[in-house]
Design a protein with these regions (language model features):
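N-terminal Sec-pathway targeting helices
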Residues: 2-12
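TPR/TPR-like (Sel1-like) alpha-helical repeat modules
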Residues: 199-202, 206, 214, 218-221, ...
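Short helix-capping/linker turns of helical repeat alpha-solenoids
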Residues: 60-64, 76-78, 95-99, 112-113, ...
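Canonical positions in the second alpha-helix
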Residues: 56-58, 90-93, 129-130, 167-168, ...
Length: 251
């Protein structure tokens, strides 16, 4: 009788536990992306335990968005062990074939984090994979340009660096547009071309890149890039660069 009762109780506990896991899994998968974004912002801004715990639990029950948000919060942590955990979580996501995680991991490994050294070889691996999914990703293209231009973890390749820099500029990344303008302006890795230099410099300035507006200001003051000297344009772009810097400092 006791054995039979024990069996019944064991079955009941198993059913209850299974029901709990099922309900928890369903609940986790139904958490809105807005809620996940809110936990992510709170966790990154305040490093509070509660939003991090929420992301951990939701991620543990199979919510893919929560898993990626958790990785982002962890790599921005003030604690080295959590930053390492975040990089490893991004690596797992990248291995699972998530293009955004591959792009982010490649960027992190290119720049490094406090206490975590860059790994240029692995960075190039993930960035190349990410680019194969989306060749229009401006940041991925720019990061690859940086690797090839500087010869990080490989032999320097100026032609590949320019190819990726052009992709990043065409995809709308202001810093890439500014650097491409300088390539045309100074004839470093591209033929000297003032018209193209001015075109890309203007696009970067219109995107509120401070150094682009300052460079454009000096071009007007000195009559460079085919521009006539113009003091009013010079001061207009100086003021615009100051505005851009204030905007950047508030971000």
């Amino acid at each position: 009788m006791n054995a039979r009762l024990s069996l019944v109780l064991a079955v009941a506990v198993a059913i209850t536990a299974g029901t709990f896991v099922t309900v928890a899994t369903v609940a986790a998968t139904r958490v809105s992306n807005v809620q996940i974004d809110d936990w992510q912002m709170q966790g990154t801004a305040t490093h509070a335990a509660w939003p991090l715990w929420q992301l951990r639990v939701t991620s543990a029950f199979g919510n893919a968005a929560a898993r990626e948000a958790l990785a982002d919060v962890l790599v921005n942590s003030t604690r080295l062990d959590e930053r390492r955990e975040g990089v490893e979580l991004y690596r797992q996501l990248a291995l699972d074939g998530a293009p955004r995680a591959q792009a982010t991991l490649g960027h992190l490994l290119l720049r490094g984090l406090p206490g975590i050294a860059p790994d240029y070889v692995e960075s190039r691996h993930w960035l190349t994979l990410a680019a194969s999914h989306d060749s229009r990703d401006a940041q991925v293209a720019y990061d690859l340009a940086t690797l090839y231009r500087n010869g990080y973890g490989m032999v320097r390749d100026a032609s590949l660096a320019i190819r990726w820099l052009e992709r990043a500029a065409q995809a709308g990344l202001p810093l890439a547009q500014f650097q491409l303008a300088n390539e045309y302006r100074f004839g470093t890795s591209l033929p000297h071309d003032d018209a193209l230099a001015l075109q890309w410099l203007t696009r970067a300035a219109n995107a509120e890149l401070p150094e682009a507006n300052l460079a454009l200001a000096m071009a007007y003051r000195n009559g460079e890039l085919g521009l006539a000297r113009d003091e009013s344009e010079y001061w207009a772009h100086v003021k615009e660069s100051e505005h851009d810097l204030k905007h950047v400092s508030r971000q």
